[in-house]
């Protein structure tokens, strides 16, 4: 009989079962092998009522609970013998689960599911393996929430517990089409959250081993409704990032569907799987709704009094109020746009970081305006200072007191161009189109970039698009007995005469230096440099109070004393490398600085001329580092002039190539909008080409270099022979800029 049974039921032999009397087995079914058969008893969508945590109104009241139970069996036993004794009686399971659920209170879905699994695996139900899916369709106002767990009688945990959020229906700005950048559209989000189902020896295992779904949902809803992503991939990834980083989710599946994406499809969407390790500290990017991480752009304007002083004072006050300025644009002068009968404006934009929320930021900016004396008499009329929030990250706000993005930004060149100075690839949060595209659509750009001189309350402007500015002449006044060009023929007695000649000949700036910079020259003591230049600057300031004086020095202490004596500009041939205090000093003094490219020092610069395969690319890299360092030190971008360093750390061929390709260097994105100074005057390479050994005789080589500089887009020329070079620049401006 037993032999017959074994023959009829070879399944027993396969699984190593031994049949005894009745329904008793000496050897139990191996659970892992049982699961491979996928034989299951189901109870689908059993709706009961119970208190499971809080309902959608945050109350501990009865709410519907939908249960689906799957219990592992060996269907071959009960099927072949047609005997329920070999299976699980789902009626018994139903009764026991019903009794448990409707007569108990549960902390959360995990507590409920865990206790149901213990009932199914208990002596009455005789289960060995169970999958419990528990849902609370009324658990949240916007979505259905639920949980799936798998438990075994032997206590082994096979897979992670899975919390799920289904059919979270929200409205947000999403897409790349123009209409999608204006109108919010419906999206459906499904989430599956994985949690390691560790069998903790603790009564409150269900409390320790769960997620705060309510808190997670609240943040996701806020995040999605405030977001303005162009792709659902970006939105899905941001949801995964927030979940894993902010809520400690171990692993997540995010599904995002756009219900209106395709005319003849129910939806189009994306599904991603991410774990917490995907967002490690090395590649973690904060959520876009993290206030401290959002890029905030503030526009600044003034058209009364000392305009640049008001703008600089506003920036200083912002830093005091916790509004950290990260980057500034160039400064532009613009004609009044709305109320025409008023003075021209200075305009700029700064990128800031702040923990203030938009409404708080607006309050602080308005307070700064009040502190600086702004009184509004006429709408869009004259004002000493005007501060506006242009963008606040991706936020879109439309309240009675604040509209973000600024409603008139797209019609204002004096805001669009400064934005591009800071970030060339910036896009409008609502339309998704680039700021550059809007700027190009404006036909009449009635703005011009300016270099302001705070203590003179004046500025010089530069060419921009259709507006053409003349090339400015910086006259060299070296008060050095070891000067490489003239042996130091200038004395204090002749300073006034020489400066008067320079001014009459067309010079705009007088560059005074007390330290020779020729290769091989020695560095004089600090006291000696101060003795040479400070009295001369004071004398010139007294005699010619309106002349712009530049101090040619690489020492911060000399620069500070020179500015206090009357200098308006610092010209540092080392680009801030020789004195680590230089950039901070210039930032504090609030004056422009000319940053020159060079390598090494006066003794070894001629040996440091290896620029690899492309001198322009290498100079760009090295000069950009100096530029970034200056800006990080607090020097506004509008107070920076660049100099490629002709004759410094460059061979004859490299100097010629630099002149020939100067426009290529100037056009680099990292130097966008910055003015350039070139100093080819009487340099050794000009004399080598023309055969003039004596510096005084190198005028013809200098002439050609000046013409080349202007043709390449140079803004300021630093020269010795002012009269001749001014004439040359006038003719060059007529040819290259059509100024005549």
From Swiss-Prot:
Provide the residue span(s) of the region labelled DHNA 2. 161-280
Q: What does this protein do?
A: Catalyzes three sequential steps of tetrahydrofolate biosynthesis.
* Pathway entry: Cofactor biosynthesis; tetrahydrofolate biosynthesis; 2-amino-4-hydroxy-6-hydroxymethyl-7,8-dihydropteridine diphosphate from 7,8-dihydroneopterin triphosphate: step 3/4; Cofactor biosynthesis; tetrahydrofolate biosynthesis; 2-amino-4-hydroxy-6-hydroxymethyl-7,8-dihydropteridine diphosphate from 7,8-dihydroneopterin triphosphate: step 4/4; Cofactor biosynthesis; tetrahydrofolate biosynthesis; 7,8-dihydrofolate from 2-amino-4-hydroxy-6-hydroxymethyl-7,8-dihydropteridine diphosphate and 4-aminobenzoate: step 1/2
| Name of this protein | Folic acid synthesis protein fol1
Residues annotated to bind Mg(2+): 478
One GO MF annotation is:
metal ion binding
Single Gene Ontology BP annotation: folic acid biosynthetic process
- Say if the entry is tagged with keyword tRNA-binding: no
Originating species: Pneumocystis carinii
């Amino acid at each position: 009989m037993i032999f017959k049974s074994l023959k009829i039921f070879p399944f027993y032999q396969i699984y190593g079962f031994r049949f005894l009397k009745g329904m008793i087995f000496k050897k139990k079914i191996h659970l892992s092998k049982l699961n491979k058969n996928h034989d299951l008893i189901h109870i689908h969508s059993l709706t009961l009522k119970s208190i499971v945590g809080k309902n959608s109104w945050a109350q501990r009241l009865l709410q519907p609970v939908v249960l689906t139970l799957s219990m592992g069996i060996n269907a071959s036993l009960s099927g072949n013998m047609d005997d329920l004794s070999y299976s699980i009686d789902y009626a018994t399971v139903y009764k026991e689960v019903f009794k448990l659920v409707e007569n108990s209170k549960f902390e959360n879905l995990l507590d409920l599911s865990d206790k149901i699994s213990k009932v199914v695996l208990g002596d009455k139900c005789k289960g060995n393996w169970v999958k419990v899916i528990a849902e609370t369709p009324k658990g949240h106002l916007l979505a259905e929430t639920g949980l799936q767990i798998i438990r075994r009688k032997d206590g082994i945990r096979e897979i992670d517990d899975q919390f799920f959020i289904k059919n979270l229906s929200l409205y947000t700005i999403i897409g790349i089409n123009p209409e999608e950048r204006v109108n919010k559209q419906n999206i459906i989000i499904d989430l599956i959250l994985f949690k390691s189902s560790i069998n903790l020896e603790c009564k409150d295992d269900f409390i320790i081993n769960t997620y705060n779904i309510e808190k997670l949902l609240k943040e996701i809803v806020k995040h999605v409704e405030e977001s303005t992503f162009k792709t659902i991939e970006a939105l899905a990834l941001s949801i995964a990032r927030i979940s894993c980083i902010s809520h400690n989710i171990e692993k997540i599946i995010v599904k995002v569907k756009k219900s209106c994406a395709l005319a003849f499809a129910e939806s189009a969407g994306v599904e991603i799987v991410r774990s917490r390790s995907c967002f490690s500290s090395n590649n973690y990017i904060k959520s876009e709704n993290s206030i401290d991480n959002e890029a905030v752009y503030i526009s600044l304007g003034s058209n009364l009094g000392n305009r640049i002083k008001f703008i600089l004072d506003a920036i200083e006050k912002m830093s005091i109020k916790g509004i950290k300025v990260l980057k500034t644009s160039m400064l532009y002068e613009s004609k009044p746009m709305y109320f025409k009968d008023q003075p021209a404006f200075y305009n700029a934009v700064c990128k800031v970081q702040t923990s203030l929320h938009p409404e708080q930021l607006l309050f602080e900016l308005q307070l700064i305006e009040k502190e600086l004396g702004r009184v509004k008499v006429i709408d869009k009329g004259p004002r000493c200072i005007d501060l506006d929030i242009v963008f606040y990250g991706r936020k879109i706000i439309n309240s009675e007191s604040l509209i973000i993005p600024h409603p008139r930004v797209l019609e204002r060149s004096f805001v669009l161009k400064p934005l591009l100075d800071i970030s060339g690839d910036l896009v409008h949060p609502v339309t998704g189109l680039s700021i550059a595209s809007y700027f190009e659509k404006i036909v009449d750009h009635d703005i011009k970039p300016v270099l302001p001189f705070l203590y003179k309350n004046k500025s010089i402007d530069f060419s921009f698009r259709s507006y053409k500015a003349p090339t400015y002449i910086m006259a060299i006044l070296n008060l050095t007995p070891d000067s490489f060009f003239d042996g130091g023929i200038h004395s204090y007695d002749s300073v006034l005469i020489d400066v008067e000649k320079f001014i009459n000949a067309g010079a705009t700036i007088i560059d005074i230096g007390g330290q020779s910079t020729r290769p091989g020259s020695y560095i004089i003591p600090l006291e000696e440099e101060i003795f040479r230049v400070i009295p001369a600057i004071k004398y010139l300031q007294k005699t010619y109070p309106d002349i712009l004086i530049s101090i040619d020095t690489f020492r911060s202490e000399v620069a500070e004393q020179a500015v206090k004596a009357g200098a308006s500009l610092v010209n540092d041939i080392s680009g801030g490398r020789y004195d680590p205090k230089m950039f901070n000093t210039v930032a504090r003094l609030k004056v422009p600085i000319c940053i020159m490219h060079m390598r090494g020092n006066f003794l070894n610069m001629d040996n440091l001329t290896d620029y690899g395969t492309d001198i322009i690319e290498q100079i760009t890299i090295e000069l950009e580092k100096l530029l970034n360092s200056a800006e990080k030190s607090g020097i506004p971008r509008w107070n920076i002039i660049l100099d490629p360093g002709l004759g410094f750390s460059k061979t004859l061929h490299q100097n010629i190539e630099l002149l020939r390709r100067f426009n290529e260097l100037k056009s680099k994105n990292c130097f966008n909008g910055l003015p350039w100074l070139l100093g080819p005057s009487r340099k050794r390479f000009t004399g080598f080409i023309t055969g003039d050994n004596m510096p005084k005789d190198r005028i013809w080589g200098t002439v050609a270099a000046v013409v080349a500089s202007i043709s390449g887009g140079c803004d300021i020329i630093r020269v010795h022979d002012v009269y001749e070079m001014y004439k040359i620049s006038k003719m060059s401006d007529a040819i290259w800029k059509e100024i005549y």
